[in-house]
């Protein structure tokens, strides 16, 4: 018996023994969700309009080579649904999350998924391990509200786990309270737009001359990539899969007066999101909606291996930088995004009193 077979057999026995009869015959309506690539998020209700449902999602693992900067640096990436990060899935507390995980025959490695929001050993990883050419269906109950990451955890041990995550295999789930988001006093909070920013550290090996190396296959890249990863010094720290993925023409959009919810995840390293010229009106820094949000933050902290959420109402037009406020990572390694906000300037909030001019000598005292 192989290790993989033993793990799956033990997990299956545990599942059968622990599963009550009601879970085998859920009398709930089903909703099939068409996922979209980040930073966008699929349509969803902020306040649940009916009782719990079975929310159906489909995630397809894809191994592919991608370009991660304007220099043409290539990564042998591993992804969910072809994007880094994988899609954000939105449900409500009490819903059942039913995920079909597909590993196409065109892939070369086993993959699975660990849901941080789920309750059960390995977050479902032992029950979702699929070889190329296989698919599996996992269902778990959303019992805790908040934003939670998911990631690949093949086998649960050894170098495959950090390699798959550092190659792009993570995403997030948002479990909303059934009656929606609220402030510390219980007042309802609403957002007009939502964006999902997935921060990712990459470790691209270099040759003897310091140039980034390119590999034909994932297996070819494995040994050198692991050596680079063990030094814990990323060559790139990016938002949504590559340098400038969310800047310029790809900037996230908003209008003055609109409230935007920003979901931010990092599966590996700590991060310090900061909206340049804006604030976190309400921030769930640990990502858990059962905790009251902090208010009026200038910079917030996302622990490695977690996700957080921040709500902000834009009051001025312009281009807002959204950065990891480790400025080396923001400006040198790529952790920068933009919000492009349209509207009318409020001169009461900010105005240039005098335009730049030559320095004037100060009058001497009599």
What residue spans do the PLM features occupy?
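Sec-dependent N-terminal signal peptides
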Residues: 9-17
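Copper-binding active sites and cupredoxin-like electron-transfer domains
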Residues: 24-366
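Sec/Tat signal peptide C-region and signal peptidase I cleavage site
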Residues: 19-23
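Bacterial N-terminal signal peptides that target proteins for export
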Residues: 1-10
């Amino acid at each position: 018996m192989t290790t993989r077979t033993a793990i799956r057999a033990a997990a299956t026995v545990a599942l059968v023994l622990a599963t009550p009869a009601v879970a085998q015959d859920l009398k709930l309506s089903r909703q099939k969700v068409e996922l979209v690539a980040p930073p966008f998020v699929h349509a969803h209700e902020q306040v649940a309009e009916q009782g719990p449902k079975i929310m159906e999602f489909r995630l397809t693992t894809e191994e592919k080579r991608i370009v991660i900067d304007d220099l043409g640096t290539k990564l042998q990436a591993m992804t969910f649904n072809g994007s880094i990060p994988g899609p954000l899935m939105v449900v409500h507390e009490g819903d059942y999350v039913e995920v079909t995980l597909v590993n196409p025959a065109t892939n070369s490695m086993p993959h699975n998924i660990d849901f941080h929001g789920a309750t059960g050993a390995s977050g479902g990883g032992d029950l979702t391990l699929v070889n190329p050419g296989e698919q599996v269906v996992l269902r778990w109950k959303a019992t805790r509200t908040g934003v939670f990451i998911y990631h690949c955890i093949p086998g649960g041990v050894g170098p495959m786990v950090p390699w798959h995550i550092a190659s792009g295999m993570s995403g997030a789930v948002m479990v909303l309270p059934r009656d929606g988001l609220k402030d510390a006093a219980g007042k309802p909070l609403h957002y007009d737009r939502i964006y999902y920013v997935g921060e990712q550290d990459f470790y691209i090996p270099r040759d003897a001359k310091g140039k980034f190396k390119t590999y034909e296959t994932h297996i070819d890249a494995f040994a050198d990539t692991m050596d680079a990863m063990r030094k814990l010094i990323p060559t790139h720290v990016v938002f949504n899969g590559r340098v400038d993925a969310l800047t310029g023409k790809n900037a996230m959009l908003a209008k003055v007066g609109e409230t935007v919810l920003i979901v931010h995840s990092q599966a590996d390293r700590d991060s310090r999101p900061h909206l340049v010229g804006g604030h976190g009106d309400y921030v769930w820094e640990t990502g858990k909606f059962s905790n009251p949000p902090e208010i009026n933050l200038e910079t917030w902290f996302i622990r490695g291996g977690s996700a957080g959420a921040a709500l902000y109402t834009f009051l001025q037009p312009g281009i807002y930088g959204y950065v990891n406020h480790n400025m080396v990572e923001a400006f040198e390694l790529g952790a920068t995004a933009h919000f492009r906000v349209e509207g009318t300037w409020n001169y009461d909030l900010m105005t240039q009193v005098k335009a730049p001019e030559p320095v004037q000598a100060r009058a001497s005292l009599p």
